[in-house]
Curated annotation (Swiss-Prot):
Name of the gene encoding the protein in the UniProt record: MT-ND4L
PANTHER family in UniProt: NADH-UBIQUINONE OXIDOREDUCTASE CHAIN 4L, NADH-UBIQUINONE OXIDOREDUCTASE SUBUNIT ND4L
Name the record gives this protein: NADH-ubiquinone oxidoreductase chain 4L
Species, as recorded: Tamandua tetradactyla (Southern anteater)
Localization of this protein: Mitochondrion inner membrane
Assembly information from the UniProt record: Core subunit of respiratory chain NADH dehydrogenase (Complex I) which is composed of 45 different subunits.
Enzymatic reactions: a ubiquinone + NADH + 5 H(+)(in) = a ubiquinol + NAD(+) + 4 H(+)(out)
Keywords annotated in UniProt: Electron transport, Membrane, Mitochondrion, Mitochondrion inner membrane, NAD, Respiratory chain, Translocase, Transmembrane, Transmembrane helix, Transport, Ubiquinone
Amino acid sequence: MSSIYMNILLAFTMALLGLLMYRSHLMSSLLCLEGMMLSLFILSTVTMLNTSFTLSSMMPVMLMVFAACEAAVGLALLVTVSNTYGLDYVQNLNLLQC
């Protein structure tokens, strides 16, 4: 495995560990998710360029569309929770507490 792939996989792993360790605040969880999506985008782009497979050229674009949708929904949820509760804790998202 080349060093480029190792660095990208290391970035994905660090973002995943950050998501698992710092999951008390919604904003830190969203940042870790964005880091994971960015590393997946770079990995798919590098893989597409190395294989020269023309049908896979839409995969990075579709991944960025899903990442933008995820960011928009996450930020809308963050604004709603912070306006309702005044905090951005993930534990406030539990619907069973209502």
